[in-house]
């Protein structure tokens, strides 16, 4: 029977076995929760991948930016590729949570290992009388596992049993026969040599953990044994020592283990046989040789005692136990090793949750922005194009005379230069005799044509430059902005139609343009500079009449092609040009081109608008899916993984006296937890899935925020699965504890300067939340806590959400709720409204309800009055500037409420003025400062 026949000491092995069972049972329970969370996480990512087809992939890449958001960390590179469980992380976590614990006993020699095994199991199962050296010993590996019946067999590791007659099979045994432990030297069967001895026993400890006694060094080194087990089980390594000192081979073995595996090891000095099992206690100043050797090997350090007491941070460290009665520390050591493993796994899983949850939130911002800004961009594009069209038509209608003058001026300024260039011109593809004899009429026509082309090209460039400068302002005021806006619309539409192309846009800009035809029209009709400089179709049409006019000139064959002849041809061509006709032709064709471009643009824009209409419907569906399904579901998994991490590191908090009750939970005093003292513990029992989701998201937002002096710190969370006797599940939120809330402070009486400082603190806290993209939605007296110096901190982020994650639900405390909250469409200005009401209480100095609200018989009556514009009354003690600030903050039109960046300096000015005035005139109140 377990526990009988073992070496005895004070307390016996039963206590050690019970403690070890508790440690491994604790591990297995938490491992089961971690495995469940991992299964749900994998299922979540599968559901996200296949939900609504490719809708999520197309929606993930929209938008051009996101606010900092709760938690930060955006995704700008395709989105959907990151909303996934990376394969390497999934495989690593799956492997980690599938490991079962195993106690591996190493040692100086077989006797030490066997003696330790016998002590642990409370039975003399292995013989301890072997006298051969460890290097010459040939004992095989021994594995002890749980079963209902005692059984001994040879088995290949993780494979099958060998059919082999063993000494233990011949009859009853208490100690396993020596010959079954040995590897026979004459055995020719390789399977027999590598097989391990498997011992099945009905012991309670073996239900929780397998125990393996390593083979002797003569058969397999400790390093090789560890190599086999490292990626299969969770090892708790024990090193049994029977001698007063480690031998050189022991030191070398331990040194190699440390270099290769960096494992913490529990070193135990087994008692000498036949000697009193209770070793004499050493004083703190006495350090054994073993301790010094392990210090030199860097297994032990001076920051924890030689007795093996656990370190304060509960990180697994090697221990040395030289007294049998302290073997119970093996339970502490095992718990630390197991805890470290669980914490690392829970942390890795929570990092996956938080990373993807932050991406979801940032994408919700992107989608919300897309829904808001796309219709405005379409309207802006239509309006600006129309303004551009009308402006260019006005130029064509009103500036014909200016164009005529411009052409005359250009010709006049360029005439000499043109004539000189024509005289020096070298003709192409025409052979001119050196003696200047006349050439054929065909060659003469070619010469004339080349001179015409020279004049046309030079005049084209000069007039184009003049025309560009005349409409230069249009390029900046219309075309540039219009093009950027249109490009953004086209890109977002293209991504929705062809999601895969969004990844290629950095390589090929043309790929993501949805309407190349529309772009060509804009380039031809509106980009005046590009059109004239590039010699496009418009340019050729504008100057076609120039060619026709020049070609109608009658030429007399010259006696020879000389410089004078070329100059004469050029001069006649220039003089034959009509500036008025050219100007009229330019304006006429310009108007024609503008009309056709305008009509084509309008048609293309309607097509683009239709495409965006369908895309925005899908985006809104996806936005709802993210807000109401994906993000809350992932947030709950994140809450569970983080709570598991917290309970492993810091344990379950102890509830003190009740401090107060709220709508969704009870607040208790908690003396200390996780190194924080004192704490407040909020116990919340979510009644349904919606409240679970809200709580999980609240927790994520609070944990994502950096510590801020105007917000109450959240230290951690623990999920109590046995709350109320196991009838329900409670979430315990451990927070910073402060002195009192503002409601209690006002009832007790606070000085004016203190109250105004509290108002400044509240504004600073709300501003920080808004800077992180969060809206509190429940600013009130009870949610402002005061420390012992009466400095304020905002608490209870139960209704706090990023704007993009708000569903329009009606939340908050009635008297602090802005009118637009009842419509379901609101933004962070609801916090400004609530602050206005809070400021009324701060300035009044009491907690009595405003008369207008006190007369209301019900919440519905109160809400109706607020919607109709009823607000708190002005009290006689109010300063004029304070009253104006209140009225501005609770304005019924949310767009007219001041930004908190404006409110804060106003409050500071009020405080400086009133408090300085009060110090000079102690009896002066708020009403005297108007």
From Swiss-Prot:
Pfam families: Pkinase (PF00069)
Any one GO CC term of the record: cytoplasm
Catalytic activity: L-seryl-[protein] + ATP = O-phospho-L-seryl-[protein] + ADP + H(+); L-threonyl-[protein] + ATP = O-phospho-L-threonyl-[protein] + ADP + H(+); L-tyrosyl-[protein] + ATP = O-phospho-L-tyrosyl-[protein] + ADP + H(+)
Expressing tissues: Widely expressed with the highest expression in brain and ovary.
Function: May act as a positive regulator of ERK phosphorylation downstream of fibroblast growth factor-receptor activation. May induce both caspase-dependent apoptosis and caspase-independent cell death.
Record-linked CDD domains: PKc_Dusty (cd13975)
Organism: Gallus gallus
Residue ranges the record marks as coiled coil: 383-428
Principal localisation: cytoplasm
PROSITE patterns: PROTEIN_KINASE_ATP (PS00107), PROTEIN_KINASE_DOM (PS50011), PROTEIN_KINASE_ST (PS00108)
A GO molecular-function descriptor: protein tyrosine kinase activity
Location(s) in or outside the cell: Cytoplasm; Cell membrane; Apical cell membrane; Basolateral cell membrane
Catalytic residues as annotated in Swiss-Prot or TrEMBL: 778
Any GO BP annotation: positive regulation of fibroblast growth factor receptor signaling pathway
Family: Belongs to the protein kinase superfamily. Ser/Thr protein kinase family.
UniProt-recorded name of the protein: Dual serine/threonine and tyrosine protein kinase
Annotated keywords: ATP-binding, Cell junction, Cell membrane, Coiled coil, Cytoplasm, Kinase, Membrane, Nucleotide-binding, Serine/threonine-protein kinase, Transferase, Tyrosine-protein kinase
E.C. designation(s): 2.7.12.1
Binding site for ATP: 659-667, 682
Taxonomic superkingdom: Eukaryota
Span of domain Protein kinase: 653-907
Cited InterPro entries: Dual_SerThr-Tyr_Kinase (IPR051302), Kinase-like_dom_sf (IPR011009), Prot_kinase_dom (IPR000719), Protein_kinase_ATP_BS (IPR017441), Ser/Thr_kinase_AS (IPR008271)
């Amino acid at each position: 029977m377990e526990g009988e026949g073992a070496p005895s000491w004070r307390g016996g092995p039963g206590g050690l076995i019970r403690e070890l069972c508790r440690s491994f049972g604790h591990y297995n329970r938490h491992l089961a929760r971690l495995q469940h969370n991992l299964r749900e996480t994998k299922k979540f990512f599968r559901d996200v991948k296949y939900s609504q087809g490719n809708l999520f992939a197309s929606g993930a890449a929209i938008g051009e930016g996101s606010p900092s958001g709760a938690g930060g960390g955006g995704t700008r590179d395709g989105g959907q590729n990151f909303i996934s469980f990376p394969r390497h992380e999934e495989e690593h976590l799956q492997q980690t949570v599938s490991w079962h614990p195993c106690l591996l006993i190493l040692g100086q020699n077989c006797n030490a290992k066997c003696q330790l095994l016998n002590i642990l199991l409370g039975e003399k199962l292995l013989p301890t009388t072997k006298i051969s050296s460890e290097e010459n010993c040939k004992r095989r590996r021994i594995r002890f596992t749980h079963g209902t019946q005692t059984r001994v067999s040879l088995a290949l590791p993780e494979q099958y049993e060998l059919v082999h007659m063993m000494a233990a099979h011949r009859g009853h045994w208490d100690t396993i026969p020596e010959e079954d432990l040995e590897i026979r030297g004459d055995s020719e069967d390789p399977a027999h040599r590598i097989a391990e001895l498997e011992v099945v026993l009905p012991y309670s400890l073996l239900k929780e953990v397998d125990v393996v006694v390593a083979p002797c060094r003569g058969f397999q080194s400790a390093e090789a044994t560890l190599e086999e087990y490292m990626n299969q089980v969770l090892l708790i390594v024990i090193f049994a020592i029977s001698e007063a000192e480690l031998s050189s081979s022991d030191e070398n073995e331990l040194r190699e283990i440390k270099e290769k595996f960096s494992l913490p090891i529990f070193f135990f000095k087994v008692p000498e046989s036949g000697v009193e099992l209770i070793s004499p206690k050493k004083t703190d100043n006495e350090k054994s040789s073993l301790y010094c050797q392990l210090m030199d090997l860097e297994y032990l350090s001076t920051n924890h005692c030689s007795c093996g007491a656990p370190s304060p941070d509960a990180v697994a460290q090697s221990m040395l136990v030289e007294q049998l009665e302290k073997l119970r520390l093996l339970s502490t050591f095992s718990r630390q090793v197991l805890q470290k493993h669980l914490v690392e796994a829970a942390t890795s899983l929570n990092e996956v949750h938080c990373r993807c949850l932050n991406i979801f939130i940032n994408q919700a911002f992107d989608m919300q922005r897309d829904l808001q800004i796309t219709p405005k961009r379409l309207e802006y594009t239509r309006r600006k194009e129309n303004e551009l069209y009308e402006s260019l038509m006005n130029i064509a209608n009103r500036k014909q005379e200016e164009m005529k003058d411009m052409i005359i001026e250009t010709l006049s300024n360029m005439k000499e230069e043109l004539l000189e260039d024509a005289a020096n011109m070298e003709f192409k593809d025409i052979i001119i005799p050196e003696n200047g004899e006349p050439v054929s009429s065909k060659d003469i026509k070619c010469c004339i044509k080349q001179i015409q082309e020279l004049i046309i090209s030079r005049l084209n460039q000069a007039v184009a430059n003049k025309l560009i400068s005349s409409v230069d302002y249009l390029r900046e005021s219309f075309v540039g902005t219009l093009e950027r806006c249109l490009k953004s619309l086209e890109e977002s539409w293209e991504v929705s139609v062809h999601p895969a192309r969004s990844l290629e846009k950095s390589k090929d800009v043309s790929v993501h343009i949805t309407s190349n035809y529309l772009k060509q029209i804009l380039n031809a009709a509106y980009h005046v500079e590009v059109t004239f400089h590039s010699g496009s179709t418009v340019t050729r049409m504008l100057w076609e009449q120039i060619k026709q006019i020049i070609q109608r000139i009658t030429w007399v064959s010259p006696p020879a092609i000389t410089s004078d002849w070329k100059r004469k041809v050029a001069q006649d061509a220039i003089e034959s040009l009509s500036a008025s006709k050219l100007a009229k032709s330019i304006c006429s064709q310009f108007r024609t081109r503008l009309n056709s471009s305008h009509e084509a643009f309008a048609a293309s824009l309607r097509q683009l608008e239709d495409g965006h209409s369908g895309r925005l419907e899908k985006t809104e569906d996806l936005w709802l899916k993210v807000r109401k399904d994906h993000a809350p579901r992932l947030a709950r998994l994140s809450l569970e993984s983080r709570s598991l991490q917290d309970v492993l590191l810091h344990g379950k908090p102890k509830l003190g006296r009740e401090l107060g009750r709220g709508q969704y939970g009870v607040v208790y005093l908690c003396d200390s937890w996780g190194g924080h003292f004192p704490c407040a513990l909020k116990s919340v029992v979510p009644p349904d899935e919606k409240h679970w989701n809200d709580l999980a998201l609240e927790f994520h937002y609070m944990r994502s925020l950096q510590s801020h002096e105007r917000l109450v710190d959240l230290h951690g969370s623990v999920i109590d699965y046995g709350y109320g006797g196991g009838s329900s599940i409670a979430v315990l939120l451990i927070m910073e504890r402060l002195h009192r809330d503002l409601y209690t402070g006002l009832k007790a009486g606070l000085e004016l300067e203190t109250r105004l400082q509290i108002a400044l603190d509240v504004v600073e806290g709300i501003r920080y939340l808004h800077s992180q993209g969060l809206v509190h939605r429940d600013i009130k007296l009870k949610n402002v806590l005061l420390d012992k110096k009466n400095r304020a901190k905002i608490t209870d982020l139960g209704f706090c959400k990023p704007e993009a994650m708000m569903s329009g639900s009606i939340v908050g405390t009635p008297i602090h709720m802005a009118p637009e909250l009842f419509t379901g469409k609101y933004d962070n200005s609801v916090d400004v409204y609530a602050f206005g009401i809070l400021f009324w209480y701060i300035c009044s100095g009491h907690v009595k309800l405003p008369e207008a609200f006190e007369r209301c018989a019900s919440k519905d009556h109160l809400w109706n009055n607020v919607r109709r514009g009823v607000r708190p009354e002005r009290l006689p003690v109010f300063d004029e500037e304070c009253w104006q600030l209140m009225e501005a903050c609770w304005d019924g039109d949310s767009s007219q409420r001041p930004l908190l960046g404006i409110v804060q300096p106003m409050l500071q000015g009020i405080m400086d003025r009133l408090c300085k005035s009060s110090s000079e005139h102690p009896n002066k109140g708020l009403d005297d400062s108007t």
